């Protein structure tokens, strides 16, 4: 598609930006963001008129734990700070059934949360039925999202998203949790979902293969009305779609975001100074994670366990990908590392070193 044709296709169509910098970004700093860091970024995002700002532990409500990491702030503290600080931006939270329960959602509603997003594995939308039904009955905006979507076909994802709408979701979306997609993958999936539902469709990208902005643009051009993006790409692994890049590219293509560019750039500068020791980079392990189709949040524990057990983290990622592991199965990292070490010590090579390319 030429640039002129792309502008004609956009034709001033609105795209709503959701900013999970203070939720997904937590993965990159072991969930250690503090109160003043929250306040600084919340004020900046609010001033830039970012439509929705999402806060929380990297894995959402009630996920702070030994298994996936203790958060420095409690859910209550994060939501309280956000509610006190935001004046124009809506406040969003994420929950995974299994980590969080309906009681955790009730607790979030006490902070007048504007949007609750319920995430499930890409073939398990039915797990969200109870929670979406509760939010529907409460009159709260609720979106259903499916993760690890490279593991499902476009038709399967469309079917799962249609189920989410039937349960009460007022929006649906897909997460490229491992940064595995290319634009054509996104176009096929978003197109199929848009044809199957009559609610806004969302895309959330990761940058393991350097495709997050391109994939997000492909999603918008295929009909997505909501895009996730984080300041400086702050997020797990190689990071998320970079917010301050995505917005002007969308505007240049003719989409409307309603975001103040200069203030958005200011917010990104604050994020760079206050939230992260360094911006995300596409390193060798991140590339392997994307190729293997493994959740980007596994990067730090894989590196730690690989160093401890004396095995190649790339081999761990490819084996985890072969097993199709998902978030919440972090215990399998140790199992895989031990198996690789045993195979090596037994003179049975665990990997040829060539990967799946």
From Swiss-Prot:
CDD domains per record: DRE_TIM_HOA
Q: Which residues form the signal peptide?
A: none
Q: Which InterPro entries match?
A: 2-IPM_HCS-like, 4OH_2_O-val_aldolase, Aldolase_TIM, DmpG_comm, DRE_TIM_HOA, PYR_CT
Q: Where is the active site?
A: 27 (proton acceptor)
User: What EC identifiers does the entry list?
Assistant: 4.1.3.39
Q: What class of enzyme is it?
A: lyase
List, for all copies, the residue spans of the domain called Pyruvate carboxyltransferase: 15-265
Sorted keywords for this record are: Aromatic hydrocarbons catabolism, Lyase, Manganese, Metal-binding
**Molecular-function GO term, any one:** 2-isopropylmalate synthase activity
Superkingdom per UniProt? Bacteria
Q: Which residues bind substrate?
A: 23-24, 177, 204
- Disulfide pairs? none
Q: What is this protein called?
A: 4-hydroxy-2-oxovalerate aldolase
What species is this protein from?
Streptomyces tendae
What gene, per UniProt, encodes this protein? nikb
